[in-house]
């Protein structure tokens, strides 16, 4: 069973970290502007936030960039992160991956977990910096130790596949677990596969079912298919082919070819559902189009239908192919 791949870069903004005092006039826009002009880094950062979000002022991305830069150059960590995010993914300015990496690094060194995570992804992908999987692992670890679930997940992938660090399936399971317990769907799925296959941990069908269910309930189609298999075979859970079909159907509707084929088989044999050869044909057909179908079973199903039924089945198959091909 395949596992999920690396997570993508997250975008997030840090807002004011300046404590409010009883003198609220000190935090009025004119007061912030005056303080910023006098060189106060926290005020410069505040002004950058206001201009970026159009908070109490007309939105002005260029001014936001200027004020973040002033604060960042004075060592303000949140300003450094926001500046990096602007260079990395703000549609209103020209993207500059190298500058993004420069400022992510500044903020990461100061301990901001999002900066550490995004810096790790930059090293992993060679985006704005020479690709370096070892450095990616270093920064995933830093962010993961602070509880960043995406970093924990990517660190687990690194251990699982031996990318940038010696392969260690047990450590992969440790980090998948940390991310999974925070609700990370892909980590839940990969942890389930680890329990299912006994990789890095003793095989445990019931724990595999537990984590497949967690991921499946979040819409992970691979987990939905695998959970269907567990119910179909009574592995780690009481055998229930009706529930198996429910999970196959959820995954099939999301374009999972294996689930489409599994659902077709159950329609063909009437397992957990009333036998329906037209449905079987249609699901076999879309599964074949997705590269996961049993072509022999598709032909076998076609032979079991009369001409009129086959014509209807082909129309149904065409509609399924239009809707449920894998993206």
Regions found by a protein language model. Name each.
Residues 45, 66, 81, 102, ...:
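TPR/TPR-like alpha-solenoid signature
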Residues 14-16:
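N-terminal signal peptide c-region/cleavage motif recognized by signal peptidases
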Residues 37-40, 53-55, 60, 73-76, ...:
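Short helix-capping/linker turns of helical repeat alpha-solenoids
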